[in-house]
Amino acid sequence: MVSSCCGSVCSDQGCGQDLCQETCCRPSCCETTCCRTTCCRPSCCVSSCCRPQCCQSVCCQPTCSRPSCCQTTCCRTTCYRPSCCVSSCCRPQCCQPACCQPTCCRPSCCETTCCHPRCCISSCCRPSCCVSSCCKPQCCQSVCCQPNCCRPSCSISSCCRPSCCESSCCRPCCCVRPVCGRVSCHTTCYRPTCVISSCPRPLCCASSCC
């Protein structure tokens, strides 16, 4: 007797590999043996059917989020899992904390939720990424000079701004420019380490700098 839901090619006994035709792609026929390119439909996206040849855009469901299914076409809201963090899946909509891997550190992924130490690379230095855990020398760009990014490792010439002049960020390299009187020699930057010969400005003559 022919099954009423699986088309004329499927028998009552189940979906054998030789019977997996396009007309057999229904939930009741989605078994491990039925994972073929012609069977990649939303109704067939079950855990037993998550194979590379079934990873099409229509098959990106929560039950199909496996490493073998992480392709460019599978970057959707239902595919945000660590095992899916591959280079082809680095898109803004995929940037969640669980997906912050070295292969996913791209400018499009530089969001607040994706600012982890392992994601601190030069291409990921955006204002939204200036958190304490992301303050590394390679992230000290002009756009990244925020108060919460003023760490000793961030004291480079491009990061010497008033907003970065905190006690932990007052290094000699922040006092070497002629404009240091209004940049590095800020009220919060009166530290002995900042008073060098190239920065003898009256504005720097605080009691702690004498």
From Swiss-Prot:
Protein family membership: Belongs to the KRTAP type 4 family.
Ribosomal protein listed as a keyword: no
Pfam families: Keratin_B2, Keratin_B2_2
Function: In the hair cortex, hair keratin intermediate filaments are embedded in an interfilamentous matrix, consisting of hair keratin-associated proteins (KRTAP), which are essential for the formation of a rigid and resistant hair shaft through their extensive disulfide bond cross-linking with abundant cysteine residues of hair keratins. The matrix proteins include the high-sulfur and high-glycine-tyrosine keratins.
Organism whose genome encodes this protein: Homo sapiens (Human)
Keyword Transmembrane helix: no
Gene symbol of the encoding locus: KRTAP4-9
UniProt KW keywords: Keratin, Repeat
Domain of life: Eukaryota
GO CC list: cytosol; keratin filament
GO biological process: hair cycle
Subunit structure: Interacts with hair keratins.
Name of this protein: Keratin-associated protein 4-9
Tissues expressing this chain: Expressed in the hair follicles.
Signal peptide: none
UniProt xrefs under InterPro entries: KAP
Transmembrane segments: none
Sequence repeat windows: 24-28, 29-33, 34-38, 39-43, 44-48, 49-53, 54-58, 59-63, 69-73, 74-78, 84-88, 89-93, 94-98, 99-103, 104-108, 109-113, 114-118, 119-123, 124-128, 129-133, 134-138, 139-143, 144-148, 149-153, 159-163, 164-168, 169-173, 174-178
Region (29 X 5 AA repeats of C-C-[RQVHIEK]-[SPTR]-[VSTQCRNP]): 24-178
